[in-house]
C-alpha cells in the first residue's frame, strides 16, 4: 500500500505459488513447529529461503490461534 511508510530497502511480499502453499499447509497440519534442520530441508525443496518459511509458519500459527479464539467466542455466544 502506498500510504504505509516502509523502509526503502524493504523486500517485496513473496508471491507463493499454489504448490508452495499446498506444501506449506500440509506440513503445518503435520507439525506446527519445524526444527532448524527441517526448515532448511523444507525451504530448499520449495525453492524458498529459510526466512520465508520461518515467517510463513509464524504467520500461520497466528492465524490458527486467531481462528481458534474466534471459534471459542462463537461457541460462548451461542451458549
Swiss-Prot record:
The keyword ATP-binding does not apply. Its main location: nucleus. The keyword DNA-binding applies. One of its GO terms (biological process) is embryonic morphogenesis. It comes from the Eukaryota. PROSITE patterns: HOMEOBOX_1 (PS00027), HOMEOBOX_2 (PS50071). Pfam families: Homeodomain (PF00046). It is found in: Nucleus. One of its GO terms (cellular component) is nucleus. Residues 9-68 bind DNA. Gene3D superfamilies: Homeodomain-like. It comes from Apis mellifera. Belongs to the Msh homeobox family. This is Homeobox protein H17. GO terms for molecular function: DNA-binding transcription factor activity, RNA polymerase II-specific; RNA polymerase II transcription regulatory region sequence-specific DNA binding. Keywords: Developmental protein, DNA-binding, Homeobox, Nucleus.
Amino acid at each position: 500500500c502506498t500510504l504505509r511508510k516502509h523502509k526503502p530497502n524493504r523486500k517485496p511480499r513473496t508471491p507463493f505459488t499454489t504448490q508452495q502453499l499446498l506444501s506449506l499447509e500440509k506440513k503445518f497440519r503435520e507439525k506446527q513447529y519445524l526444527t532448524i534442520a527441517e526448515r532448511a530441508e523444507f525451504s530448499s525443496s520449495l525453492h524458498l529461503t529459510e526466512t520465508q518459511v520461518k515467517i510463513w509458519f509464524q504467520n500461520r500459527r497466528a492465524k490458527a490461534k486467531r481462528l481458534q479464539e474466534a471459534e471459542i467466542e462463537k461457541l460462548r455466544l451461542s451458549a
